[in-house]
Amino acid sequence: VQLSFLNRKVDPVQYAKSFEIAPQGDDFDDIRAEYTAILQKQLASGNNGIVKTKYLTFTIEADSLKTARARLTRIGLDLLGYFKTMGCVAHVMDGQERLEVLHGIFHPDGEPFRFDWDWLAPSGLSTKDFVAPSSLCFGTAKTFGLSGKYGAVSFLQILAPELSDEMLADFLKTESGILVNLHVQAIDQTEAIKTIKRKITDLDAMKIQEQKKAVRSGYDMDILPSDLATYGEDAKKLLNKLQTRNERLFMLTFLVLNVADTKQKLGNDVFQAAGVAQKYNCSLVRLDYQQEQGLVSSLPLGINQIKIQRSLTTSNVAVFVPFVTQELFQSG
């Protein structure tokens, strides 16, 4: 499962037009014109045309396309039911909507997306030609070029023992081009319990070695390295959660993509995002020589090429469930 949270710019001209209230030829046209001017003034000093959207991408493995379609349809209906229970409005995207999302990521200035399925056969083009950027450059270690702009992908190093549900919201409060992606892979419950038991056995073996060393050196065998004692307690607590509290174990990859007009603006945006991570005792680290893989993993395609993962339980992953507040907007 991939969760994507996108802050992107829209075409300012088209966005401004959506605030216009058409005259009706009656005595209230002056009021409509005044109200339109007020809305456009607020737009100029507001969110700078930033639209915030959330996407959930799920992938499966199947023996055939027919089987995959049936399973994907069933899972999609189940997810819509879950969203409805949460009070969240959602719908399954069609092919053109998915292409428009990819186009928006590759064209961060909000250029309008022009596409029709009937254009493919006569033109000899593929869908990739309609969404691809004018240029991509991965010549440096920690940044990349995207159609004359600069981008950088970072991963979140989760160091905090407890996660706050406000961290994701703070990342998305920034009024800049940012794309936050969470790749979540569930681990089989039996395999997860076996893995943790093996870790506990390894820690117990290390504990025995430390005690033998203490006896040979002539000091108290109950004095153990603090890290060893802490890791042992944490592993036993985790095992208890999986066995008694119906928790599952997940592998999480947390990626942050920033895009800006200049290198200096990009540096400021990344620094701001790193400040949010530091606020919650985490660290945002720029990917070294993996910017291309990071960009691919940041697209809502359910593909994760960054194998930097952190194991989390169900309750910890649930912290990143998107909030259900919705921005109300009605054009005209």
Show where each model-derived region lies:
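Glycine-rich phosphate-binding P-loop
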Residues: 332
